[in-house]
Swiss-Prot record:
Predominant location: secreted
GO molecular function: digestive hormone activity
Name of the featured protein: Secretin
Lineage of source species: Eukaryota, Metazoa, Chordata, Craniata, Vertebrata
Function text: Hormone involved in different processes, such as regulation of the pH of the duodenal content, food intake and water homeostasis. Exerts its biological effects by binding to secretin receptor (SCTR), a G-protein coupled receptor expressed in the basolateral domain of several cells. Acts as a key gastrointestinal hormone by regulating the pH of the duodenal content.
């Protein structure tokens, strides 16, 4: 099955969450 797309999706989610946390820390 598509394992690569899943990992890429997961990494993107993690990155977006980290960005949100960074933005919250800036505010």
């Amino acid at each position: 099955h598509s394992d690569g797309t899943f990992t890429s999706e997961l990494s993107r989610l993690r990155e977006s969450a980290r960005l949100q946390r960074l933005l919250q820390g800036l505010v």
